[in-house]
Design a protein with these regions (language model features):
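Amphipathic alpha-helical protein-protein interaction surfaces
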Residues: 165, 331, 424-425
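Transmembrane alpha-helical segments that form the functional core of multipass membrane systems
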Residues: 254, 267-415
Length: 481
């Protein structure tokens, strides 16, 4: 680790060797109390207007009040005067080495270097341009806050602090060991979060070495290093209100600079079917919506497989009138029912991916054209049957009821359809048992993934919010019935 030199020229030479070719590197030589100095920063990351008004103006006003015998003569004396005997808004911790200097500068801060002093004064005059606080498009709600996380870490931390106005909220910031040196934050409530879990997360993130860090989800392989896992015991949110609610339950929230997505851990399976609106409506209606979401999730996984199993292996269980229509539709298509269902499922995923990755102005058009023209043309040409299109459409709509489970639901739907088409009822039962085994085998930090999923007072069917508030809940203790 290269320590700062007492020579201003050596420090500037070291910075010029690293950033001299960069157009945004800014180094301004100044003189304070007849002592040579320099202000170093990155243009457009630090606000020059704030810098001059706060730093130099304050130093100039302080000069006439000094007696001649107290006038500083060396860089160390100037540093002590500015740090301890002036109104300059300097950070408490000075810069002592080159790595720390670069870290502060890349965070949008300005650093004052003085000749004859091995320390640098740091000023928080960030002027970073970023996306404003907006409503997240992926998490809709009818009531409650409309704010969403921004891209800057400090802005996101302030949004959480504004909601949780207690001394129990702790926000630890650190720098990731990656090429980008991205800053991240670990947030938790010290009176609710498990101390062992917090220490484990802190240690894991310190030891993690991602090549790049662009989002909080990049930490998941280090936090839960299982090679094959369909369900991850974590959740994501872009709403400060949701993150604050999770913090009050004793959970840990991880934020990464440059990403509006917050990683929440540990997470339960039943929480994929909750939303903020559940607690703003009556218990009866929110319970109905939760039952609807559970049904939609299992429908999105098993409906194509059950349809293939019944139509191919157990046609006697289908009502005769419906069976005759399915058989008539299948006679007009060249593919067997099993292959036809797989083709439609894959085709719907292609359409979804195209609509998602296309520019927003074209994405809706692509989805509409694919749904109307391609689907109608496929049926008219006899490539696909109407019952298969209907089943696949119901499945595609059902999976969007629980968007946080879209990835595992898509893979499980393909797996269940393959098992039902190749092995019939036996394959369908084995696939269902496999899904159940996958869910029951997951735990995060000692908390089972299915903890309290069905029989909790805030599970599939919940009590009214007044009754829930009588028993404060944290993730580390199961709320009794």
């Amino acid at each position: 680790m290269l320590q700062l030199s007492s020579s201003l020229e050596e420090n500037l030479a070291a910075l010029n060797a690293r950033f001299g070719a960069s157009a945004d590197f800014y180094a301004k030589r100044i003189e304070l109390y007849h002592c040579p100095g320099a202000i170093v920063l990155f243009d457009n990351m630090a606000s020059l207007q704030s810098l001059w008004s706060l730093l130099l103006d304050a130093a100039t006003r302080h000069t006439p009040s000094l007696e001649p015998e107290r006038m500083p003569h060396t860089g160390t004396q100037v540093y002590d005067l500015l740090m301890n005997h002036s109104g300059l808004p300097a950070e408490d911790s000075p810069v002592k080495d080159m790595d720390d200097l670069i870290r502060r500068m890349t965070a949008g801060m300005a650093v004052l270097l003085l000749d004859g002093c091995k320390k640098g004064l740091v000023f928080s005059v960030q002027g970073l341009k970023s996306r404003s606080v907006e409503e997240p498009s992926g998490e809709g709600n009818l009531r409650g806050s409309r704010e969403g996380f921004a891209d800057l870490l400090r802005v996101n931390l302030s949004l959480l602090r504004r909601l949780i106005r207690t001394d129990t909220l702790v926000m630890e910031t650190a720098q990731a060991d990656c090429a980008m040196k991205t800053e991240y934050a670990i947030c938790y409530c010290k009176d609710k979060a498990g101390k062992t879990a917090v220490a484990r997360v802190r240690r894991t993130l310190q030891e993690a070495k991602p090549e790049v860090l662009l989002d909080s989800s990049y930490f998941v392989p280090w936090l839960f290093p299982a090679r094959w896992r369909l369900f991850a015991p974590v959740s994501y949110t872009e709403r400060p209100a949701s993150a604050a609610a999770k913090l009050c339950e004793g959970k840990i929230v991880i934020l990464v600079n440059g990403s509006p997505s917050a990683l929440v851990l540990p997470s339960l399976f039943c929480e994929n079917f909750d939303c903020l609106d559940d607690y703003a409506t009556t218990a009866v209606f929110s319970s109905f919506l939760r039952v609807l979401k559970y049904g939609s999730f299992y429908l999105s996984i098993f409906l194509p497989g059950v349809f293939v199993c019944l139509a191919v292996y157990l046609p006697e269980l289908i009502p005769p009138q419906l069976l005759f229509k399915i058989a008539a539709a299948e006679k007009a298509t060249p593919l067997p029912l099993f292959a036809e269902m797989l083709l439609v499922i894959i085709l719907l995923e292609i359409i979804r991916e195209a609509g998602l990755r296309m520019p927003q102005t074209l994405g809706h058009s692509v989805s509409l054209v694919a749904a109307l023209i391609i689907g109608d043309a496929a049926i008219g040409a006899g490539l696909l049957s109407t019952p298969v299109i209907l089943v696949a459409s119901i499945t595609a709509i059902s999976v969007f009821v629980t968007p946080s489970l879209y990835e595992p639901a898509t893979l499980l739907r393909l797996g269940v359809t393959l098992a039902a088409g190749l092995a019939g009822p036996v394959g369908l039962v084995c696939a269902a048992l496999g899904v159940l085994a996958a869910l029951t085998s997951i735990s995060a930090m000692g908390v089972p993934y299915l903890s309290g999923a069905a029989f909790s007072v805030d599970g599939v069917v919940r009590r009214n919010y007044r009754a829930l508030s009588r028993r404060p809940f944290t993730i580390w203790q199961r709320r009794g019935s």
